Structure formats: structure tokens, C-alpha cells
Amino acid sequence: MPRRRRSSRPPVRRRRRPRVSRRRRRRGGRRRR
């Protein structure tokens, strides 16, 4: 029974993160506490 070729590391669930501009977020977050 041939073994299936798979990556050694287990499957990892990727978190979906909305695209946010770091510059804008930092400025807004700092100003609006």
C-alpha cells in the first residue's frame, strides 16, 4: 500500500484577516484611545 505524499507538518487553519493599512490603523488607534 503506497504511502501518500504529504507535508510533514499537520494542516493548519489559516485565520482570515481583513486587509488593513498599518499606517492608518496606528494613527487612528493612537488618536482615538
From Swiss-Prot:
Region feature (Disordered): 1-33
Organism: Oncorhynchus mykiss
Biological role: Protamines substitute for histones in the chromatin of sperm during the haploid phase of spermatogenesis. They compact sperm DNA into a highly condensed, stable and inactive complex.
Subcellular location: Nucleus; Chromosome
Expression sites by tissue: Testis.
Keywords: Chromosome, Developmental protein, Differentiation, DNA condensation, DNA-binding, Nucleosome core, Nucleus, Spermatogenesis
Name of the protein this chain belongs to: Protamine TP14
Any one Gene Ontology cellular component term annotated for this protein: nucleosome
GO function terms (MF aspect): DNA binding
One record GO biological process: chromosome condensation
